[in-house]
Amino acid sequence: MNLSQTAQFKKDMKRQLRQGKDQKKLIAVVEILLAGRPLPAKHKDHPLKGSWRGRQDCHIEPDWILIYRIKENELRLERTGSHSDLF
């Protein structure tokens, strides 16, 4: 599977790193997704609705979310941040 990141995701990630988030936690989740394996239940992976339809939401930490889309052979990282940052 190929990996891509939106420009907004890259900005979001810079903000998360400035806030002291551990990038290794995000990398571990992305590696599972790239391998095509389901995420452990603690990540609360679920589809989104409304304007986010077609995307998935999972928790890196309780208030650190990753929004992504898997389409064909591509994992696209679209947004990351807290609930208040994203919704």
Which residue ranges define each predicted feature?
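Basic, Lys/Arg-enriched alpha-helical interface segments
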Residues: 1-62, 70-78, 84-87
